[in-house]
Design a protein with these regions (language model features):
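Cysteine endopeptidase catalytic domains of the caspase/legumain-like
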Residues: 2-369
Length: 369
């Protein structure tokens, strides 16, 4: 590892990875096996951020359901997002930080703001270690309605509560930019308040009861981009039903999001030439991809505000790589033929094709973090 890090430092890769201070909070708010797809949605995003090289100590995964180990899961403990079963979303190294009854409105917002009492946090991994320089990805999925997201089929996260928590997190120096992805019915009703300039410029929050207050910032408003899977009055739809399990296994918005993200990691050129993402990684292009897919049956709402100019111009200047990690950037170097100046720690598999080599290079890059 020392040799590998030395090689990367010579090529400027360590500094680039360090600059990409990305963190992720991924929340599935539903319980019960019938909500299998919500757990699967969260695991799809978890898989994506890990493919991009984000280490588990920068990811907080909250799963309200027990679908992986539920007796009704004929494939337990595996989880799949489609009937093809080409990707197990629950590998042995998955790290779930908050489970089932722990996944509450209070805990989810407490992780975002880092205002949880010590007695409730049994492990440091349950905290989001972001700073004022961090870009934070917040993903939410579950059952929702007009200005609310249900938790554990009994409680509700109101849109006003989420907006207040995001504002407080910013003033407590928890992020510099935030990307919110939400997959639920009437999702845009939950994101709308995040772009209310008057609300987001409200005074700083009171001192934390946990005694761990960060210095408050006086910046005007947080820089936020949001993607909502549906408009007010619209439903979000499941992707497909697995006949063996008898339930829907993923939702269309998140399934297509995951497909887009995976394509940004696959090189378009053959081995021996510089690799480039197969699709444009800008958030504006993600919006176009989702809006034009024709498979969602709902309308995508994308917006940016705060220190950023309003969409679509702001989305043009933001990349999914900024929020999901730096591996997609390092792949452009790691994916080139091994040389004395820049080589992975081990040679590629003999006879590897370009996609196979890309997967190998991505696995190599994970060891860096």
């Amino acid at each position: 590892h020392c040799v590998l890090v030395s090689i990367l430092r010579c090529n400027g890769m360590v500094g680039m990875a360090g600059a990409a201070d990305a963190h992720a909070l991924i929340v599935s708010s539903s319980r019960l096996f019938t909500n299998y797809r919500h757990t699967s949605n969260a695991l799809l995003v978890y898989d994506a951020v890990r493919r991009f090289g984000l280490p588990d100590d920068r990811i907080v995964l909250m799963l309200g359901g027990d679908a992986p180990c539920n007796p009704r899961n004929e494939e337990r403990p595996s989880m799949y997002a489609s009937m093809t079963r080409d990707l197990d979303l629950y590998p042995r190294d998955v790290e779930v930080d908050w489970r089932q009854e722990e996944v509450t409105v209070e805990n989810a917002l407490g992780v975002l703001t880092d205002r949880l009492p010590d007695r409730r946090v049994s492990s440091p991994r349950k905290r989001l270690r972001s700073t004022s320089q961090s870009r934070v990805l917040l993903y939410l999925t579950g059952h929702g309605g007009d200005e609310f997201l249900k938790f554990n089929d009994a409680f509700e996260l109101a849109a006003s509560e989420l907006a207040t928590a995001v504002r407080d997190a910013f003033r407590l120096r928890r992020f510099s930019e935030l990307l919110l992805l939400i997959d639920t019915c009437q999702a845009s009703s939950i994101t709308a308040l995040l772009h209310d300039a008057a609300l987001m410029r409200s005074p700083p929050p009171p001192p934390s009861p946990a005694g761990r207050d960060h210095a408050a910032t006086t910046a005007a408003s947080p820089r936020i981009a949001t993607f909502a899977s549906s408009l007010v009055g619209e439903n979000s739809f499941s992707h497909e039903v697995d006949s063996l399990l008898g339930v829907a296994v993923s939702d269309r918005f998140t399934f297509q999001l995951h497909a887009y993200l995976r394509r940004t990691l696959v090189p378009t050129s053959s081995r021996g030439r510089s690799a480039a993402p197969a699709v444009d990684p800008r958030l504006s292009e993600l919006h176009k991809y989702l809006a034009r897919s024709g498979r969602l049956r709902s309308t995508i709402a994308a917006e940016a505000s705060g220190g950023l100019s309003h969409a679509p111009a702001a989305l043009d200047n933001m990349s999914v790589h900024s929020f999901f990690g730096a591996a997609a950037q390092t792949l452009r170097i790691v994916g080139t033929p091994p040389t004395a100046a820049a080589a992975p720690s081990t040679p590629p598999p003999t006879g590897a094709t370009a996609p196979t080599y890309a997967r190998w290079a991505t696995m190599e890059s994970r060891a860096l973090w």
